[in-house]
Amino acid sequence: TPHTGWGALERQPGQWDWQELDAQMAYLDSVKMGYGGILIGSPEWNTADPPGHLPVNHLKGWSHYVTEVVKHCQGRIRRWEIWNEPPNFTGKNQTPADYAEIVVAAYDAAKDVDSGCLIGLAAKSAHLNYLEQVIQAGAKDHFDYITLHPYEILSTVADNVGTEPMFMNIVPSVRKMLAAQNPAKANVPVVFTELGHDLGKGPEVQAQALVKAYTMGAAQGVACIQWFEGRDGDSGPMGLLDNKGQPRPAFTAMREMIRHLGQQPVYLGWIPLGGIHRGFVFEGQAGPVLVAWAQNAGSCEFKPGASVQSVDPLTGKSSNGPAFTLTGAPLLFTNLPRPLITDAKANRNRPMQWWGADYSSATSVSLTTGENQKLDGLRSLSGDALAKSVVAYGGSARAGGVPGGNVFVVDPAFLSYTREPLEITVVCRRNEANDNAGFKLIYESTTGIKTAGHWFTIPDNKTWHTATFRLEDPQFVNYWGYNLSLESDGNTYNRYYLKSVEVRKVKDRR
């Protein structure tokens, strides 16, 4: 993205410097790369607003900046995102209403200059609660598309803990929110103007995350995904290329995805692959292409009914055969038999039921931990690597000592965006040493991440104890990649065993 910030362009009142911006746009044009712009920032000479704040006290200057930059870039930049990841990079005490104020001013100024330009309403991560509040505060009808940066949700997918349903629910949740708050904009494009994964768990995991992100993004209707980043330099390392310009497996994966699916993949539908595993079928460059992997660190046998070609997107190497073993590493399949394509098209609008059942009509979801773990519409993201199953007091349980707390997600079909009172029941027990232990419940609410009303101290280790939390204002949108968390404020009070957790819808309102 070329540098279109206010402070870089108008260093002194009325003195505009376009040289660097023009050079950047000329380079991007020369390599035939599409680009947009960001309306952001406040120059040092604007003393009406503190540094790092939305310029709400100098809206006249902000509107003039928008007018000048949109006019200067007309015909080259059509899409303008307003700010970067709000409420990030705004004042500590600034509100959704403040952001709404600069959105309205920017929208009006930009449209006056270029009626064909498009204005993007932005939020960090997948913070739909914030977007909802911005629309309610005055931004209604003053945007043409939505931009999100759902790094955290992709990170859980990359960890292969079975959170594909959360990622696949981003656009549907946006649609729900818009239908409720701004029906005229319910179907505007959703763009991931940043999305990426670092090399913390290796270059292969990064590349696999890229394939899954673009596959599920295209399948749910994301209009465009901009991978962060092309080459190491800003943060990370997260680039397709390292800081010396050498390609990583993610570069090869991107190349193979484009080679087989094209620049604008056309989603045909999905197929079941046995149990909880799913595959996505697209109309590719030379015929239909299936992208498939096994979720939740599992594996499954894929028998397409005919000999097909398999392509490893991380290497570009291919093989042919009638059967394949799928793992968490995605594969591309071509030369698909017609019945498979027909089935995929028939499934396109059907619920995917990733977790083996349809929870849309369920009144509760739960999990029981331990050796005979039972997952019924509720999952922990803590993972076996962090909290191994243990046998305690003659029954199965899970250690509570998880760094960052025990983190949970519900099946989106059970509850997503819709506000409904919940009762959370946690069955737990102190450890054998009877160490003092307890936790608080953190959850996604209508105002963001929130702590439930009280701290629960586990009484003793003599029996299993039940902690109950009543939530009046939950709003699950996975903007940090989870819905619920049991947090013990460090590693002092987390020495307990967790037997079960239940999330139940409560019909009576207090």
Where are these regions (language model features)?
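Glycan-recognition and processing domains
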Residues: A344-L415, E502-R504
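Substrate-binding cleft and catalytic face of glycoside hydrolase catalytic domains
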Residues: T1-L154
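Carbohydrate-binding surface patches
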Residues: P272-S307
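Extracellular beta-strand ligand-recognition surfaces/modules
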Residues: T466-S500
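Extracellular ligand-binding interfaces
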Residues: G401-Q475
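Noncatalytic carbohydrate-binding groove/subsite architecture in carbohydrate-active enzymes
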Residues: P96-Y214, Q220
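C-terminal beta-strand-rich structural cap/linker in extracellular carbohydrate-active enzymes
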Residues: S319-G356, R470
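Aromatic/acidic polysaccharide-binding cleft in carbohydrate-active enzymes
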Residues: G196-R259, L268-H277, Q285
